[in-house]
Every structure is written in C-alpha cells, then in structure tokens.
From Swiss-Prot:
Main localization (coarse): cytoplasm
Locations listed in the record: Cytoplasm
Keywords: Cytoplasm, DNA-binding, Transcription, Transcription regulation
Domain of life according to the entry: Bacteria
Pfam name, any one: Transcrip_reg
Record-given protein name: Probable transcriptional regulatory protein PMT_1423
Sample GO molecular function, one term: DNA binding
A single BP term in Gene Ontology: regulation of DNA-templated transcription
Entry-linked HAMAP family: Transcrip_reg_TACO1
UniProt keyword annotation of Cytoplasm present: yes
Length: 247
C-alpha cells in the first residue's frame, strides 16, 4: 500500500484545528446519530461502536456522545435525527477522481455547496457512479506502537505471524504504529482479532481506496487538487473524502 499522501497530512493537521473549534465534534455527533438509527446499544451495533470509538479517540465529551445516540435512536425529546448518508462524486483538476461521503439533512443544500466548491477550484461535480468504479471499499485498523516490545516500534515479524490467523491482506508500518488492511466485510473480526492477540487497537474504519492513482503534470496542478480537497473538507456536511491523487 502507498504511504501517507500529502492530502493525508493535510487532513491530520486540519483535524487538530477543527477540534479546537468544535467542528470535529459536530461531525462525530452526526456519524453517531446516523449509526444509532439501527439501535442505541453499541454492543449490538458495530457501526455505532465504531463511531463512538472515533469520538472517544478525539476526546469528545461523554455527554455529547450520549446526546447523539439519543437523537439517532429516537429517544431525544427534541425529535429524531433527520440526517442521511449520501455519496457524491466528481472530478478535480487534471481528471483526479473525488468521492465524497456526506451526512446531511438537506440534499439540495449539500449538492449546491459541493458544486460551487468544485467549480471554484477547477473541478466538476459529477453524476452518481462517474468515479465510484475507480475505488474499492476497504477495512483499516490502526495499531499503536505502545503494544510493541521492540523499542516502541511494531515488530514486522510479529505482526506478520499474527495476521496469518486473520482475514487481513496487507499492512503498513508507520512511525507511531501500523495500519492493517482487509476486505470491507472483515472489519469487525479484524479489529477484534488483533485486540485478542494483544495489540492496542487505536481505531478502525471503512474507507474508499483508489484502485490506481494518477499524478499531476506539475506542482501547480497538484497544489490546485490539494486546495480543492481541503475546501471540500471544510464544508459542514462533508464527512469523508477519498481521491486517486498520487502520493
């Protein structure tokens, strides 16, 4: 698997800024509420358990988490959650494919905001299905190096030995741990299996990953693509963005 891209670095640094002004908490609350529609008990709702894990990792207050669960499961006195998950697709400069997952209570508003942002940055919002075939849904589990004994780094040999027993098909060692990859349907078993083997599981999620990546002709074009991705990520309704821009 390719290493972390410049876009990944932008997302990580931006997440810190967002957390300071509450934007991350708002997004996480939306994700929890949507997941809670299938049941407010995280023990029987893996999607909800995943969303709660993300919220806890971001240090979201427990009261905020409980309110989001209540809203999604219909227990909130102010009414049930009206959010819906929608996928949008489009093209960035140079034909870069962009896939956007949004949580919104107003499809028309979200589509208009996305279209304006694409146009402003040299891209175009496309029709459903125009780029989805260029991606595949994957499982990713993030391991902490704190569970390693080899100088605070994940032992590749130990990880490989453990992965032979699980439904994993790839991994990547990173500075503060490792990322384990698997098929879309394997996420629940993969994170549980790694935890049972003694690894510290910091997080897990379903992601869209490009089947192939494309590069830009020059630095200016690449910068334009990165600016588009960052602008899209700043929209309130946008939950997650994937692209096939080469690292």
């Amino acid at each position: 698997m390719a290493g972390h891209s410049k876009w990944s670095q932008i997302k990580r640094s931006k997440a810190v800024v967002d957390a300071k002004r509450g934007a991350v908490f708002t997004r996480l609350a939306r994700e929890i509420s949507v997941a809670a529609r299938s049941g407010g008990d995280p023990n029987g709702n893996f999607q909800l358990r995943t969303a709660i894990n993300k919220a806890k990792a971001a240090r979201m207050p427990a009261a905020n988490i409980e309110r989001a669960i209540a809203k999604g499961s219909g227990q909130d006195q102010n009414g049930a959650c009206q959010l819906e998950a929608i996928r949008y697709e489009g093209y960035g400069p140079g034909g870069v494919a962009v896939l956007i997952e949004a949580l919104t209570d107003n499809r028309n508003r979200t589509a208009a905001d996305l279209r304006l942002t694409f146009n402003k940055h040299g891209g175009k919002l496309g029709e459903s299905g125009c780029v989805a075939y260029l991606f595949e849904q994957r499982s990713e589990v993030y391991l902490s190096a704190q569970s390693a004994q080899d100088g605070g780094k994940v032992s590749e040999d130990a990880l490989l030995e453990n992965l032979l027993e699980l439904e994993a098909d790839g991994y990547q060692l990173i500075d503060d741990g490792a990322v384990v990859y698997g098929p879309f349907q394997a996420l629940e078993g993969l994170q549980a299996g790694l935890r049972d083997q003694g690894w510290i599981v910091e997080g897990w999620e379903h992601c869209w990953r490009p089947l192939t990546t494309i590069s830009q002709a020059d630095q200016k074009s690449e910068d334009q693509c990165l600016q588009l991705l960052e602008a899209l990520d700043e929209l309130d309704d946008v939950h997650h963005i994937s692209s096939n821009l080469e690292s």
